[in-house]
Amino acid sequence: MSIETLLEAARFLEWQAQQQQRAREEQERLRLEREREREQEQKRASNLARLAHALPVEEPRIEAPPLPLSPPAPPPAPPPPLATPAPLTVIPIPVVTNSPQSLPPPPPLPPAAQPLPLAPRQPALVSTPGLSIKEPVTLPTRPQVPTPAPLLPDAKTTVAPTGSPKPLQPLPAPILTIAPHPGVQPQLAPQQPPPPTLGTLKLAPAEEAKSSEQKKRPGGIGTREVHNKLEKNRRAHLKECFETLKRNIPNVDDKKTSNLSVLRTALRYIQSLKRKEKEYEHEMERLAREKIATQQRLAELKHELSQWMDVLEIDRVLRQTGQPEDDQASTSTASEGEDNVDEEMEGDRAGLGPPKLNHRPQPELLKSALPTPSTAPAPLPTHPHPHPHPVALSPAHLPVQQQQPPQQKTPLPAPPPPPATPTQTLVPAPAHLVATAGGGSTVIAHTATTHASVIQTVNHVLQGPGGKHIAHIAPSAPSPAVQLAPATPPIGHITVHPATLNHVAHLGSQLPLYPQPVAVSQPVAVSHIAHTLSHQQVNGTAGLGPPATVMAKPAVGAQVVHHPQLVGQTVLNPVTMVTMPSFPVSTLKLA
């Protein structure tokens, strides 16, 4: 039971005890009042009997008119009980009024003896002082009646009307003595049952409390079950939380662990993580400060470098720093005894400036800023030639068109052109370097004239997939051949021309260039082959030797173009530049 129910029960018991005590007091007071009323009625009856025998009948008729004036007196009667001296004179008036009011009913009894009942009217007024003297005994009881309980004023009020409205019942004096008793008794009868009603009222709340307790008990049982379920769920949730915490904490024994130990280890682990976080923050701050200092130092060094170092030296330093990468990117040469050519190339490079090409990292060819494969071809600045006459074309600038019909599989020999072919345009001294417009790769082959059949080939192809080209070059052979076997993508342009690199090599006429058939094989098609040999004659003659053979073998057809061999005095590093689109793997073989 809760505290509220206990308090309610205690209050109910106290209230029940008080009600019982009040009921007892009321019963005692009612009993005393009934006894006093009986005594008063007996006294009144005896007084009336005495007055009836002593007074005549006519006098009360004369005094009858003033009697109606007396009824206004009863209304002030209720308040006077509070003051003891005033009611002594006022209260007897109702007694007088009772007697005259009780007289009107006597007319039905005139034959018996009217003077007897009418006589008391006058003596009532006469005997009022006597009554007032006798009734002080009852007056002290009346003021006590209204004060103790609320039921007493009810009884008194009922008694007062018995004197005023119910005087009809007591006709003669003896009847008056008898009538008040039944009038008082019926009042007592209903007054006595109220205590049992109080008891019933007392019992009713007790039953209601019991019923409410009984109603609360099943509700309490339900709430207890709900509470148990909630407690079970809470414990399960806590257990799950501890399990997850245990899994997240390292170095925790699974067997002997309590919740307290898990919490302690978790606290230690969290503290260690916080310490590590602070250390990492300090480390990051230190690194940031070092980075700022390093950047400032770098800026200072750059400023100092720009003050005491000119542009040429900076370019040279950059070229030296970039040289290892160029050496690694370039392929090895298969020629023998080419040190002098390398020295000449390095001298030319130093004279013309640093190389600045991304797609063609050969230092020998980077004399000027060449465009990337996606740009248009740009002319190479060459050494001006003293002779105004045009360059003799050893092989004419013959384009080889692609043959679409597959039926033409036999090589079609072309007549050897004269030293100067009028049908083809002459290539001027500044030769043009042809680059593919499709972003293709480039194969550059240098031909050195130190030996008749020694060719220095630098094969460096920059392409998307990242494949490499293999360059195989064999020294002197009677008929060396350059064989290009790329993958499926077609070759854009093949241009063979000697580049004038500000260097003139004086060679003897006894060094002929042997006939060199060049075979270019490709599975798809050869779009354009331009084989140009432009030569500048200086103090010598150019003789035409046996013709070399250029064989183009596409998948759908073939053409054979013969060109005479060039034998002259001044041949400067003929450059074979093969420009082709990107393809995965190809082989450049010179055998």
Curated annotation (Swiss-Prot):
- The UniProt regions of compositional bias labelled Basic and acidic residues, in chain numbering, are 22-44, 205-216
Indicate, by first and last residue, each region the UniProt record lists as having compositional bias (Pro residues): 63-84, 102-120, 374-383, 412-421
Positions of the UniProt region annotated as Leucine-zipper: 273-301
Q: Which CDD domains match?
A: bHLHzip_Mnt (cd11402)
The alphabetized list of GO BP terms reads:
cellular senescence; negative regulation of apoptotic signaling pathway; regulation of cell cycle; regulation of DNA-templated transcription
Gene Ontology cellular-component terms for this entry are: nucleoplasm; nucleus
Compositional bias ranges of the Acidic residues kind? 336-346
Q: How does it assemble?
A: Efficient DNA binding requires dimerization with another bHLH protein. Binds DNA as a homodimer or a heterodimer with MAX.
Reported function: Binds DNA as a heterodimer with MAX and represses transcription. Binds to the canonical E box sequence 5'-CACGTG-3' and, with higher affinity, to 5'-CACGCG-3'.
Q: Under which name does UniProt file this protein?
A: Max-binding protein MNT
Species name for this entry? Mus musculus
